[in-house]
Amino acid sequence: GVWHRTKLRTFDKGKREHGDDLIPCPFTTDTKQALFKASDMDINEELLHHPENDPAYLGLKVNQGVAAQPMVNPNLRRVARRTYTVDEFVEGILRSDITCLSQAVTLVESNRPDHQAIAQQIIERCLPYAGKSMRIGITGVPGAGKSTSIDTFGMHLVKQGRRLAVLAIDPSSERSGGSILGDKTRMEQLSREKNAFIRPSPSAGSLGGVARKTRETIVLCEAAGFDTIFVETVGVGQSETAVHSMVDFFLLIQLAGTGDELQGIKRGIMEMADAIVINKADGDNIDKANLAATHFRNALHLFPPTESGWRPKVLTYSGFYGLGIKEIWDMVDEYRHFATDSGYFEEKRQRQTKWWMYESINEALKNSFYQSDAIRSLRPEVENDILSDRLSSFVGAQRLLDAYFKSLK
């Protein structure tokens, strides 16, 4: 088409403006010549030829669109999600219905009071069927290959006939509060297995890198018949020790040549680990991985004996190539037999249950404090006093606490 502005109407790249509709206008050579000629003189309607009025273009019309085509598969039509009762949730979980399990986990993670009430009923009904799995916490530095390793570890277990649930905790943004939840995309093989359940969850700012509701989610997964539970944590470093309070075996994934061997001398996440495994021990990196393993073994000698009496081991493997995977799981099975025979396995679980009870109390008290009307009205005043140096932070905190306790009377 051509561009030509006239006093009557606008032609734009082969389209004519006609009311609110744009109609394609194929211009002939004669039309173009007439238009360019008309641009040099006063516009005359006789010189402006409209091809849409030409009998040769009787088929030219505005396409108003067509109706939606019928669906090939009517079952794909979107329907409203059905709301299950507590009894239906429990029955579905006990027969390993993944849909019921997923929706129940969503209720557990929800902050809505009505969802929390339903979730607590489901958890109480599922408790008698829980506790029969091996809970394994997996953590490590960012980029150590945790998700890829879980994919390889999981395939090894599924081939042995085990049922695996992976709870992947994804870091939430401090700015937006959002989370990518993309860990499942790096578990390509495992995500296709019917005996594997992968549930990414946001950390939601939870200290320790473990989502607050992970403990309850473990109960639901165990009731659904999963005999092995992986808890993959954010991997933020030494502050991530909360995972130790909800798992039976704590696996720390490290890399060679990153300087992390020196961190072994410090207290922290290292002394929590029941085993340290060096990933990416393949190709030209094998010698570096073996050297790093030696450094970690030397560092572990500086720690006091563990409560269980188990001596943490250091192994090397390659998650990408699947090398050394069998040796790692032989070590995990060895630990379980060791802890079960000594009675430490059951003792640790009882201690964890009590610890989480007090953690739940702390969380409930904190929520009650911040949701109090007395605190909401007093907080701005106390904050202003602190910022203008009229009060110290400790005195301001005590003033808020006094107001809260007074409101309870």
Model-derived segments and spans:
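Non-catalytic terminal/linker segments enriched in charged/polar, low-complexity residues
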Residues: 33-128, 376, 380-381, 397, ...
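Canonical P-loop GTPase G-domain recognition
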Residues: 282-335
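Nucleotide-state-sensitive switch-loop elements of NTP-binding domains
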Residues: 88-95, 103-133, 144, 153-239, ...
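P-loop (Walker A) phosphate-binding loop of NTP-binding proteins
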Residues: 141
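Hydrophobic anchor at the beta1->P-loop junction of P-loop NTPases
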Residues: 136-138
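Long, well-ordered amphipathic alpha-helical subdomains in the mid-to-C-terminal portions
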Residues: 101-103, 316, 327-405
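Hydrophobic positions on the alpha1 helix immediately C-terminal to the Walker A/P-loop
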Residues: 149
